[in-house]
Amino acid sequence: MKPRILIVDDEARMQRLFEINLGPKYEVMTAGDGEQALEVVKSREVALLITDLKMPGMNGMTLLQEAQRIYPDLPVIIMTAYGTVEGAVQAMKEGAVDYILKPIKMEEMEILIEKTLSVRRLQDENRSLRQELQSLYGPTRIVGNHPAIQRVIQLISQVAGTKATVLVQGESGTGKEIVARAIHYQS
């Protein structure tokens, strides 16, 4: 399945340019304004949002804020013909992954898109692996209703959130390694 990229620009010519150049590698969706784009973000999974900064109605900066409120992990690239250093800094502070000036060189845009999607894939994979480790080594893997076991689970949760060094002691076969892994993977 091709990654879905949403292009938001009030110029149909720019929308078409992206469709022609990116269509072979990506599923390209277009929107003419910020309101249409938000509807797409709410209803469809989008891998990347590329938006113009200056548009009638909702501008690109507001779209960035609203889209990330709905979907915080959505990478957003802002493009503009009216670039300023202050605008770029503000966009990056708001969460844009990049801020590029028009006219756009499509080769550079394709490299930026691939880099952005690679970072997103790595973040998704990292999140998935962390969840898997949590399910394998989290405190829920330690079973028992005895107050002593419940106290161990509580202690694991307490120390895992700190930078403290922990020494786990006990006789052979008492579950020291399980406790150590639970602390490690919750840290």
Task: Give the positions of each predicted feature.
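Active-site residues of response regulator receiver
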Residues: 52, 80
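Acidic catalytic/metal-coordinating carboxylates
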Residues: 33-36, 59-62
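Two-component/phosphorelay signaling modules centered on CheY-like receiver
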Residues: 12-30
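A Lys-centered signature of the CheY-like receiver
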Residues: 94, 102, 145
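Receiver (REC) domain active-site loop signature in two-component systems and cognate sites
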Residues: 55
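AAA+ ATPase active-site-proximal loops
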Residues: 130-187
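Conserved phosphotransfer cores of two-component systems
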Residues: 26, 42-44, 66-74, 94, ...
